C-alpha cells in the first residue's frame, strides 16, 4: 500500500435507496461511506422493506456533518445525533429524521477492527 493515497467519493460504489444516497470507498483495509439522507427518511420506512429485518443489524461508527437524526436501539436506548457528533451504534436500531434539512454523515469500518460489532473471535 502506498504511503499517500486518495480516492474521491464520486468514484465510490453508489447506492440510492429511497430518500438516500451513499458512496462507499476503500483505502487499504479501511472502508469509508458518505451518506446523504433526505427529509422524511427513516430506516423502518426506507430500508426495512429491502432488508426484511425488524431493525438495522449493521453496526456504525461515524460523524454527522449536517442535520439531525433520532436513533432508538432495540434495548430502548434513544439519542439524537446532530452535526459535529461522533457516534457508535450497535446492531439492532432504527433511525429517523428530526430536522427539516438533509442529513450527511461519514462512516468508517476496518478489516482490522477489534471492538463493537466487528470484534474478532
Give the positions of each predicted feature:
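Short acidic-glycine-tyrosine-enriched beta hairpin
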Residues: 73-93
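Conserved hydrophobic/aromatic beta-strand scaffold that supports enzyme active sites
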Residues: 24, 32-36, 61, 78, ...
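A short, N-terminal "cap"/entry segment at the start of jelly-roll beta-barrel domains
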Residues: 1-36, 44-45, 120-121
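Glyoxalase I/VOC metalloenzyme domain signal
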Residues: 39, 110-121
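A generic structural signal for short beta-strands and their flanking turns/coil linkers
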Residues: 28-33, 39, 59-60, 65-67, ...
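Ligand-binding loop in jelly-roll beta-barrel domains
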Residues: 90-115
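Short beta-strand segments in beta-sandwich/barrel cores
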Residues: 42-43, 67-72, 95
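Glycine- and acidic-residue-biased ligand/ion/polar-headgroup-sensing regions
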Residues: 49-75
Amino acid at each position: 500500500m502506498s504511503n499517500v493515497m486518495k480516492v474521491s467519493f464520486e468514484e465510490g460504489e453508489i447506492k440510492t435507496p429511497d430518500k438516500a444516497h451513499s458512496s462507499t470507498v476503500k483505502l487499504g483495509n479501511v472502508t469509508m461511506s458518505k451518506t446523504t439522507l433526505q427529509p422524511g427518511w427513516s430506516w423502518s420506512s426506507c430500508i426495512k422493506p429491502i432488508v426484511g429485518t425488524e431493525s438495522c443489524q449493521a453496526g456504525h461508527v461515524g460523524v454527522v456533518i449536517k442535520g439531525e437524526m433520532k436513533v432508538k436501539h432495540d434495548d430502548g436506548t434513544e439519542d439524537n445525533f446532530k452535526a459535529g457528533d461522533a457516534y457508535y451504534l450497535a446492531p439492532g436500531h432504527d433511525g429517523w429524521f428530526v430536522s427539516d434539512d438533509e442529513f450527511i454523515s461519514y462512516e468508517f469500518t476496518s478489516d482490522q477492527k477489534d471492538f463493537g460489532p466487528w470484534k474478532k473471535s
